[in-house]
Swiss-Prot record:
<feature type="active site" description="Proton acceptor">
    <location>
        <position position="319"/>
    </location>
</feature>
<dbReference type="InterPro" id="IPR023195">
    <property type="entry name" value="Nict_dMeBzImd_PRibTrfase_N"/>
</dbReference>
<dbReference type="GO" id="GO:0008939">
    <property type="term" value="F:nicotinate-nucleotide-dimethylbenzimidazole phosphoribosyltransferase activity"/>
</dbReference>
<dbReference type="InterPro" id="IPR036087">
    <property type="entry name" value="Nict_dMeBzImd_PRibTrfase_sf"/>
</dbReference>
<dbReference type="InterPro" id="IPR003200">
    <property type="entry name" value="Nict_dMeBzImd_PRibTrfase"/>
</dbReference>
<comment type="function">
    <text>Catalyzes the synthesis of alpha-ribazole-5'-phosphate from nicotinate mononucleotide (NAMN) and 5,6-dimethylbenzimidazole (DMB).</text>
</comment>
<keyword id="KW-0808">Transferase</keyword>
<comment type="pathway">
    <text>Nucleoside biosynthesis; alpha-ribazole biosynthesis; alpha-ribazole from 5,6-dimethylbenzimidazole: step 1/2.</text>
</comment>
<dbReference type="GO" id="GO:0009236">
    <property type="term" value="P:cobalamin biosynthetic process"/>
</dbReference>
<comment type="similarity">
    <text>Belongs to the CobT family.</text>
</comment>
<keyword id="KW-0328">Glycosyltransferase</keyword>
<dbReference type="Pfam" id="PF02277">
    <property type="entry name" value="DBI_PRT"/>
</dbReference>
<keyword id="KW-0169">Cobalamin biosynthesis</keyword>
<dbReference type="InterPro" id="IPR017846">
    <property type="entry name" value="Nict_dMeBzImd_PRibTrfase_bact"/>
</dbReference>
<protein>
    <recommendedName>
        <fullName>Nicotinate-nucleotide--dimethylbenzimidazole phosphoribosyltransferase</fullName>
        <ecNumber>2.4.2.21</ecNumber>
    </recommendedName>
</protein>
Length: 354
């Protein structure tokens, strides 16, 4: 384990279980039948415990959309060419992508982070330049990243989470952009969760049956080529991941270290979450999985993690779109907790005894 990574992991502590009884009692005292707001109450309770605050704040929200290219795109595993990655980054910076519309609607700030796009961007508003390399190497023929580069990307994600917490953000979210990135995400799931490649490989941006079979073969080849390197979760990330996935893992770890809840987007972001969970299981206390992706395999991944995503809307876009929508529900749940009257304060009669 790299020393800098171990120092980050050592800063992550489990959520404050000591507040659980008081928070539950408060939820039960609100002017409603106990438990009648269902998962909104569960979400509010988890948020309280994660923040360690019985009167939690939630007004400032931010999503970081991490972008990177992938050498494995050369294997023809995506329906779109690699040049779409920088094109979509420009679209986001111009405000025209789905994530822009949804973050504006939800009152969420958005940063687009260049972790490894094969393009030199000028200085633009909303763009955070943290490029490690101009794309990963082809994991079908060797490791996607060196361990040094993977560590740099991971620690960059952690730094961005810490900076956001210091800037007063209460809730963070992940997003990503990178042509072919369902391929490394699937490889990471197969190795880290011990599931078959066939069961979790999906169509990504819309590949046909023939290309799907090819994608499965490429992922299996990558795992075979890099199998001896996959001795730890971090080594597996370096061998089979990508710069945006490494940054997402670090972003989640950094958020947990700062006791800041983080909303995980879909199939790709969940791969970063799996890496983070394998490195430090305590981060689960700070995670909200935003939605069940329509991408094949995400349900199996969520079941393996024992996770229950907030939404099921057949989303498969990425970018942070599911996280932006889920943030509104989380904010609503926290407002219920903070702003509803209690039976005692409102002088509303409680349920009579049987």
């Amino acid at each position: 384990m790299p020393e800098k990574l171990q120092l980050l992991l050592d800063r992550i502590k489990p959520a404050s279980r000591s507040l659980s009884d008081a928070a539950r009692a408060h939820l039960d005292d609100l002017t409603k039948p106990q438990g009648s707001l269902g998962r909104l109450e569960e979400i509010a309770l988890k948020y309280v415990l994660a923040t360690g605050n019985l009167s939690p704040l939630l007004s400032k929200k931010k999503i970081c959309c991490f972008a990177a290219d992938h050498g494995v795109a050369a294997e023809g595993v995506s329906a779109f060419p690699a040049e779409v990655t920088p094109q979509m980054v420009y679209n986001m910076l111009g405000g025209g992508a789905a994530i822009n519309v949804l973050t504006r609607h939800a009152g969420v700030d958005l940063d687009v982070v260049d972790m490894g796009v094969n393009h030199d961007f000028p200085d633009l508003a909303g763009l955070v330049k943290r490029k490690v390399q101009p794309g990963s190497a082809n994991m079908a023929t060797g490791p996607a990243m060196s361990e040094e580069d993977a560590l740099q990307a991971l620690l960059c994600g952690a730094e961005l989470a810490a900076e956001a917490q210091e800037a007063g953000y209460h809730l963070l979210g992940t997003g990503e952009m990178g042509i072919a990135n369902t391929t490394p995400a699937t490889a990471l799931y197969a190795v880290l969760l011990d599931v078959s490649v066939e069961s979790i490989t999906g169509r990504g941006t819309g590949i046909d049956d023939e290309r799907l079979l090819h994608k499965i073969a490429v992922i299996k080849q990558a795992i075979a080529v890099n199998g001896s390197r996959c001795t730890t979760p971090f080594a597996t990330l370096a061998a089979l991941g990508g710069y945006e996935i490494a940054a997402i893992a670090g972003f989640i770890l950094g958020a947990a270290a700062a006791r800041t809840p983080v909303v995980v987007d879909g199939f790709i972001s969940s791969a970063g979450a799996v890496v983070a969970l394998k490195l430090c299981p305590a981060v689960e206390d700070y995670l909200f999985f935003s939605h069940l992706s329509n991408e094949q395999g995400h349900r199996a991944v969520m079941e393996k993690l024992g996770a229950r995503p907030i939404l099921d809307l057949d989303l498969r876009l990425g970018e942070g779109t599911g996280a932006a929508i889920a943030m509104q529900l989380i904010e609503g749940a926290v407002k219920i907790y903070n702003e509803m009257a209690t039976f005692s304060a409102a002088r509303v009669s409680e349920k009579s005894g049987e």
